[in-house]
Amino acid sequence: MQRIDHFNDPNAPRANTLIPAASAIIANEHGEILLHQRSDNNFWALPGGTMEIGENIRQTVIREAREETGLEVQPQRIVGIYSDPKHVIEYPDGEVRQEFSICFACRIVGGKLRTSDESFAIRFFSPHDLERLNMHESTHIRIQHFLEHSQNPFIG
């Protein structure tokens, strides 16, 4: 079994963990958004992952972006704080995690783009190309909030 994201699914298993996480929306100078195709569920996704003991959430998003993309980034603003109890992630080991993620808009400051052991592919997409991609609804929501350029982060 692979990782399964449940979103507004009445048949989803009940969450048994809650772990802070961060994701990065990395846009290039053309306004294209960086996504990687995950090896655990084949979805296109934003770079990101869980917080480790001893780091703050800013360090989490920088580390995860580096690990998953090869790029060095600088967080610029918070796009949103996502904690919907109707979004749970089911893992093969029996863990069912309630989402709790802070999404950051990030600027590239260095590094070289590459895939990681967590992805099949990585590339920039123009916003109008995103609808055709195999992507979880929660990723679409984060990108939509980013493209709205709101002064206030989404909280929900």
Predicted features and spans:
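Acidic, metal-coordinating catalytic segment for phosphate/diphosphate chemistry
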Residues: 1-23
